Amino acid sequence: MRILLIATNRHRRLMSRMNAQPVPIGLAYIAGHLDPDRHQLKILDLMFSEDYLADTEQAVKEFQPEMVGISLRNLDNSSYMDPQWALPITKEVIDKVRSVTKAPIVCGGPAFSLLPKECFNYLEPDMGVAGDGGETFAQLAECIESGETHRNLPGMVYRDNGAVAFNGLAYSNFARPPRLDELDMARYEQSGFGIGIVTKLDDNFSHSMDANSDGNSWRVLRPIEDVVAEIQEMKDRFDLRKIFFIDSGFNVPLPHAKALCQSIIESDLKIHWNSYLAPVPAACDEEVLGLMKQAGSGLVIMKGVAGHDLEQEALSTRMEPVQEVCQRCDEAGIHYVISQFFGEPGWNVLPRPVVV
């Protein structure tokens, strides 16, 4: 079966200031889960497109897909200076695809997974996959090809008697590497914070994480040897040396972080990497920060306090762990930024200014 995957993200700057053109790594993982002996695959990445609707129409007409996957990466561009909603572009792409083919359209991606029913209603694809969709999308392709039912698959979003049905989030173990050969990797190497590699993922990012928690609390905890092997493959195939570890909190669990850094150092990978850091003082000791620096850490992003955390404690109190971790990063020579949102659900008072 001919399958066309389209990455619709076109936002090129973070907060309207920093150059950030992320590789559609989720779509690449989807592609990696498809059986190349059974399916002919084409990836259309609209990030660098001069005319994204014309390119979409041309790709559909030339490839004649029998199934189309659409990736929605962001809900907006995360800018307070020039806020832009991301869904209209994806909606335009879906409408353009539908105007030239009757192939079923399946929508997914990080943003779609945040609000699957709402995004489904607005975008109007034929089906959706919410969550880590590698295995589900591959199974869905088999169902479409064979004519079998797909409604029992995890993560599926579909319309049932006029109402949107949702099977809950799908989960993946990311057992297969991403397929990157149809992406402009040389151009992405020069854009943003690095090429994404999944290390571990939690359902929530919170600085209440246990520094020494075991792998049972993570929905994805990839073996260190698999992560190192993927880095090596990135270097060998694409000469890439700038990596972004897709991780809910690189330093938690602390033993895992230290072991990964040590493996990177011993493998002599010589990479420059960025990631998220959990603002947990117990997971930011001198040893792990030193290992991170030696392993090539260039920048860490710390997520601040969620609105629901403020019901019983003052913001200044909740920010104390962030302040402490920032001080330790300064001492270790690790650059950092703090990501803190205000006015989200759970905020019922306007906090006083806090100096970090």
Regions found by a protein language model. Give the residues of each.
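Acidic, low-complexity intrinsically disordered segments
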Residues: 1-232, 237-239
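Structural beta-sheet core signal
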Residues: 5, 70, 107, 275, ...
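Residue-level marker for beta-strand->alpha-helix junctions and adjacent short loops that shape enzyme
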Residues: 10-11, 75, 112, 135, ...
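Short Asp/Glu-rich motifs
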Residues: 15, 53-54, 117, 254, ...
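Radical SAM [4Fe-4S] cluster-binding motif and immediate context
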Residues: 22, 177-335, 342
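Loop/helix-junction capping segments adjacent to catalytic residues or to phosphate/diphosphate-binding pockets
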Residues: 50, 113, 251-254, 282-283, ...
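Charged helix-capping and loop-helix junction motifs
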Residues: 83-92, 258-259, 316-321, 352-355
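Catalytic cores of alpha/beta
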Residues: 116-122, 288, 345-356
